[in-house]
């Protein structure tokens, strides 16, 4: 039997004080292809799974159904999400994955209990970045021109990194997260998009959201979009994969 995996939770969070030995149906929760969700016990944990029959590539609908299961579990307890598309071909493969990663799972549960993830997207469109965002094409042959272009490319990369770092520090001061994960990339409009994930206490979500207006005032010329709370995808120890 193949299992599609959604997330890992502490066994007691879905089964109370009962120590299950076999997969237990989770009432009112459906997964990909509207399949019944089961809590598959493995030591201190339960893996939220559904029976999996390959029918081709998993599309957008499956992605939304995967996210729905993780979000519903997140409302009740701490979750360690699996990457979308994670499938275990056998019961033993599933149990082995949990057994081999048990230490990392325990560390993540302790770290993330009572925590949530918030997202901020900062779109920078001001003219000061236009030159820094232009990509430098390297000549096909090695020589003085190649080295000159290579240096120019490195300078522009540092300019982008410096701008992103300065903004992330400013945003950190406004929102005071426990941890943050930052990445930036060029967008087609010629600007730069900085994607920031913040780890915060779940009880402080409203306080965090209330600081949004402050952020927009302190970041003129920058479009700021907030979303969350989400399960803490960016802050899990190690990777959850088959």
Q: Could you describe each region identified by the protein language model?
A:
Residues 1-242:
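An interfacial alpha-helical scaffold signature
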